[in-house]
Amino acid sequence: YTFVGRLVSGALLWFCAIAGAVQSQDYTHFSTDDEANNIEIFKRTSPSVVNITNARRVRTFYSLNPQDVPQGSGTGFVWDTQGHIVTNFHVVQQADRVLVTLQDGMTFDAVPVGVAPNHDLAVLKIEADNVELTPIVPGDSSLLEVGRKVVAIGNPFGLDTTMTVGVVSALGREIDSVTRRKISDVIQTDAAINPGNSGGPLLNSLGELVGVNTAIYSPSGGSSGIGFAIPANTVNRIVPELIQFGRIQTPILGINLLPQAEYYRRLWKIDGVIVLDTIAGGEPERLGMRGLTRVDGGRIRLGDVIVRLDEESISNENDLAAFLENKRAGERVTVTTRRDNRVLEYEIELQAPPSP
């Protein structure tokens, strides 16, 4: 029995060794469907991802000559073959010089083309006429569902072209931009996003752009499984305007808004957008819309407070901005206001924003 047992044990060891050798030999040709998809996404999309380094010009105590001092790094991606690069506004904010490094190591000076601080987006341009650029493939973020796989590619902590994989954890989140204006319809993901990933692409299983990684929620400053990305449909709408005009062409109502409005809403116990005054010659002025006025004794008299635009309730300036961003100059909207316990309606044609 001992002999037989040893014989069986030896046979098993021999079989395991052979199986291990076969497995090792075949591993390079084997991958699960998900692994194959990840590899394909990385190979196809990573050439579109760039490293962004920003620097400020400063004078030191020992020299009057300004020097470039590195401030930080982030990620971006190639938008088109003309050299336009998309990234986060906060990546290039206050930078005097921005360098863009392609995947092959070629580095270019970049110039700003347009920025949208309220959406934390910026467009840069590099002169790379003799270089074959690989633009990102735009996707439709409205098709995302919670549980769908997403892939982030970026340069966390300066480690270039790093890929992480996760799922869509939630949709329709709101986060603050650098201007404190709310960014709506934000994608939440558990794909690891760390400092340096900002401005990089969030991709779906087809390798299409579905978001721009912009923020993490983390007390430690590192990835904690809660990352946020600006939806691709917002990016697809804003970037062409930044390229053509240098800023978002959000139409205006022809009114000025009250600064620090939240304080006054609490003070006066009201909801809505407080009209400070109307722009001279504009349609709201002609129709009789009224802003704040001073009465006897220096008291401030409340004028029109916007509470609805078309069929959408308006509680604050974020609601107003979100409504107008989906409109175009020339469209007419119904503006519902409250004034002196009355409900008023104005039919107003939206105007193009004034030139800067």
Report residues per predicted region.
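Conserved PDZ fold ligand-binding element
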Residues: 85-86, 284-317
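Serine-dependent protease modules
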Residues: 22-270, 277-280, 298, 317-321, ...
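Charged active-site motifs of nucleotide-sugar-dependent glycosyltransferases
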Residues: 271-274, 305
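N-terminal secretory signal peptides that target proteins for export/translocation
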Residues: 1-5
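Short coil/loop linkers at secondary-structure junctions
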Residues: 270-271, 290
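Bacterial N-terminal signal peptides
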Residues: 6-19
